[in-house]
From Swiss-Prot:
This is Deoxyguanosinetriphosphate triphosphohydrolase-like protein. CDD domains: HDc (cd00077). Keywords: Hydrolase. Residues 59-250 form the HD domain. PANTHER family: DEOXYGUANOSINETRIPHOSPHATE TRIPHOSPHOHYDROLASE-LIKE PROTEIN 2 (PTHR11373:SF40), DEOXYNUCLEOSIDE TRIPHOSPHATE TRIPHOSPHOHYDROLASE (PTHR11373). Pfam families: HD (PF01966), HD_assoc (PF13286). The keyword Hydrolase applies. SUPFAM superfamilies: HD-domain/PDEase-like. GO terms for molecular function: dGTPase activity. One of its GO terms (biological process) is dGTP catabolic process. It comes from Shewanella halifaxensis (strain HAW-EB4). PROSITE patterns: HD. Belongs to the dGTPase family. Type 2 subfamily.
Length: 444
C-alpha cells in the first residue's frame, strides 16, 4: 500500500503557510498538542483524584510520559530490528498517538466512563477510546465538520478496538437500577469499540485495506458468556502506543502510590518480589530481588533510579513480531514484550489495581464522580433546550431535526468537562448554594 494513501485526510487541504516545511505527521502532532481537548487533560483524573496532592500524575502528565516512552520504544526498535525502519519512519506518528490516546476520557476517570455508559445504554453506549476517535474526527474545532482532520495512518493508529459497538455488545444487558446510587460498575462495563454513530469514518480509515484484511481486522471473539466481545487486532503504531501506555500506568502510577504512602514495602514483597524473583528471565530475577530497597528508600534519587530501571527494562524487552493473516504491513507486524517481561508488567498492573485502584478511598471518589455525571446527564436530557449551553443546544437541535442520536450530543458535552467543572456545575444545579453565571462560562 502506497504511503500517500495513508497520508490522506478526509478533508483535502491546500494551506500554504509561510516557510512551513513540516511533514503530515508533524502537523498532526501539532494539532493534537495545541487542541483544547488535550489541554483539558491537565484537570482530569488519572488514578488519584485531581487536587489530592501536587505530586501525582494527571491525564496530561500521564500522556506526556506515554509519549516519551513511546518514542523510546520506536528508537530502540529501529536499532534492534533495522529491517523495519521503513515502517518506523516517523517519530511524530508515535508522539501523536501517545499524546492523543486519553483525549476522550471523561471527568472522574473510570467512574465517569461507567456513568456515561449507563446513561447511554439504549443509545449506543460510551467508552473513552471510542470518544477519543470521535473527538479527533468530528468534535475538536480545528475544522467545521472533520475534527482535527488527521491523516489516515494516525487515525488507524488510534484504533485500539477497531470494531463497532453493535458487533461487540453482549445480547442480554443487565437490568437498569431503580436509583443511580445502586449502580454497580462491574455490571455495566463499557463496550470497547467505535460508536455506531461514527461507522462512516471508520470505513474511510480502513478504505485502503483489502477485503480480507478489513474483515480480519474488524473481527472479534467471545471472552465468556454474558460478557462483551473483544477485538483481536491493532496496527503496528497502535501496538507501540499501547505498550507505552501500559508501562506508564504500571510503573508511574506505582511511583505515585509509593510517594503518597498508599502501598507498603511488605505488600510489594508479598505480591511482586516473591513472584518475580522466580521469573524465567535472569535480569528480572536479579532486579526484583533488591528493587524494594530503592523503590521504598527515603532518598528520592534512589526511588527515581528504580523507576527508571523498570521503564528501561520494559522498553528494551520489546520486539516486532509478525501477525498472521494480513497483507498490509501496518497490520502484519506488531510490537510485543518478551513473554517474561509481559508477565512482569501484568504483575505490576495487578498490584496497582489491587492496592491503589481498589482502595476504598479511591473507590469513594470514583463513586462520587459517577453520581455527578449521571445526575448531570439526567438534568440535561430532561430539558436540553433550557439547560445546555448555546453551542451544544444548536448541535442537539440539529441532531434532532436530522433524526440522529441526540443523546450522543449530551455525552459529548459531559465527557469534555474537567473534574472541577463537572463538580462545580453539579453544585450549581443541585446545591441550595447560589452561584454566579461567570463561574459557569465554559463552552466546549
Amino acid at each position: 500500500m502506497t504511503q500517500s494513501i495513508w497520508n490522506e485526510r478526509r478533508l483535502g487541504e491546500d494551506k500554504l503557510r509561510r516557510n512551513d516545511h513540516r511533514n503530515p505527521y508533524q502537523r498532526d502532532r501539532a494539532r493534537i498538542l495545541h487542541s483544547a481537548a488535550f489541554r483539558r487533560l491537565q484537570a482530569k483524573t488519572q488514578v488519584l483524584g485531581v487536587g489530592m496532592n501536587d505530586f501525582y500524575r494527571t491525564r496530561l502528565t500521564h500522556s506526556l510520559e506515554v509519549s516519551q516512552i513511546g518514542t523510546g520504544i520506536r528508537a530502540q526498535l529501529k536499532q534492534k530490528q533495522p529491517e523495519f525502519n521503513p515502517l518506523l519512519n516517523s517519530m511524530s506518528i508515535i508522539e501523536s498517538l501517545c499524546l492523543a490516546h486519553d483525549i476522550g476520557h471523561p471527568p472522574f476517570g473510570h467512574g465517569g466512563e461507567i456513568a456515561l455508559n449507563y446513561m447511554m445504554r439504549a443509545h449506543g453506549g460510551f467508552e473513552g477510546n471510542g470518544q477519543t476517535f470521535r473527538i479527533l474526527t468530528r468534535l475538536e474545532p480545528y475544522t467545521e465538520f472533520y475534527g482535527m482532520n488527521l491523516c489516515r495512518r494516525t487515525l488507524l493508529g488510534i484504533l485500539k478496538y477497531p470494531a463497532p459497538y453493535s458487533r461487540l455488545c453482549r445480547e442480554q444487558p443487565n437490568e437498569t437500577v431503580q436509583h443511580f446510587r445502586q449502580l454497580k460498575p462491574s455490571q455495566w462495563p463499557p463496550v470497547k469499540g467505535i460508536f455506531d454513530d461514527d461507522l462512516a469514518i471508520l470505513d474511510w480509515v480502513l478504505e485502503p485495506l483489502s477485503k480480507a484484511d478489513k474483515q480480519l481486522f474488524l473481527s472479534s471473539y467471545t471472552v465468556a458468556d454474558g460478557q462483551h466481545k473483544r477485538t483481536r487486532y491493532k496496527s503496528l503504531d497502535c501496538s507501540i502506543m499501547e505498550l507505552a501506555d501500559d508501562i506508564a500506568y504500571a510503573v508511574h502510577d506505582l511511583e505515585d502510590a509509593i510517594v503518597m504512602g498508599i502501598v507498603s514495602e511488605q505488600q510489594w514483597h508479598n505480591d511482586v518480589t516473591q513472584v518475580l524473583c522466580n521469573s524465567e528471565d535472569e535480569w528480572l530475577q536479579n532486579e526484583f530481588a533488591t528493587m524494594s530497597l530503592r523503590l521504598f528508600s527515603a532518598k528520592h534519587h534512589q526511588r527515581k533510579d528504580a523507576i527508571g530501571t523498570l521503564v528501561n527494562g520494559f522498553v528494551t524487552a520489546i520486539s516486532i513480531n509478525e501477525v498472521e493473516g494480513f497483507d498490509e504491513p501496518l497490520l502484519k507486524y506488531n510490537a510485543a514484550l518478551e513473554p517474561a517481561f509481559d508477565i512482569a508488567l501484568n504483575v505490576l498492573k495487578q498490584f496497582v489495581f489491587k492496592y491503589v485502584i481498589r482502595k476504598p478511598e479511591i473507590q469513594m471518589l470514583e463513586y462520587k464522580g459517577h453520581q455527578i455525571v449521571m445526575e448531570l446527564f439526567e438534568a440535561f436530557i430532561s430539558d436540553p433546550e433550557r439547560l445546555l449551553p448555546l453551542n451544544t443546544q444548536e448541535r442537539w437541535i440539529a441532531s434532532e431535526k436530522q433524526g440522529e442520536n441526540s443523546h450522543r450530543v449530551i455525552a459529548d458535552y459531559i465527557s469534555g468537562m474537567t473534574d472541577e467543572f463537572a463538580a462545580r456545575l453539579h453544585q450549581h444545579l443541585f446545591s441550595p448554594k447560589s452561584g454566579s453565571m461567570m463561574e459557569l462560562n465554559c463552552e466546549f
